[in-house]
Amino acid sequence: MSTALEIPDILFIEESSNPTALLADFQEIRKFYEIYREGADWKSADETKDFTPAELRFKISASLINKQARFLFAEPPDILVEPNDGIDKLTEADETAISRLESLVRSILYENRFEEALIKAAKDCFIGKRVAGVVNFDEEHGVTLSFIPALQFLFETSFYNSNVIEKFVYFRAFFDSDAKEKRVYKKKYTLEEGIVFVAETIHDPSGDIVEVVLEKTPTLLAAIP
């Protein structure tokens, strides 16, 4: 479950087309996380002055969320590679290629501790109403898979089709030991005229850019998946 450093609101305000609604939603989600961690307040309704009623906190929500997450993903889902619908009969070469690809996928999931991450993501989704799955490809680190909790990303869809994502931005806070200050990494995808662009920047706590990791660059994607 998410224990990440808080992302400054200013970064969301700069990216959101409706920051007031987004920040109100975030405030509600923060309250949900507080209830999950600390329990919900409960006070006796008895107004008698003969005694001081006990103030109790119950963690029923946390117990239910933990049990439901384990129930859903104690056994991880099977990941299968299927051929294109247009292929009527697989050749031996096709079957070999599919087997190798499935082996590669299983290896990537294992290296990313997919089973553990999936249970944590389920808890984040139950609490924060949504999570994002992000796959990154890097020459140094290979293929990495991450689940991003609600308080670390935003997305916006097309006015004409809510199934089309036009913007997706996610953030990751970290501590810069050289600067002795918190930094925030931002990765932004935008869909413009059928082309997906990506940009990466690093910001200080006030939202100012301290480093451009990747200038806005077109990708080979025609949609934000």
Feature-to-residue mapping (PLM):
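Extended, helix-rich architectural segments
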Residues: 1-166, 174-175
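Active-site and NAD+-binding cores of ADP-ribose-processing enzymes
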Residues: 138-225
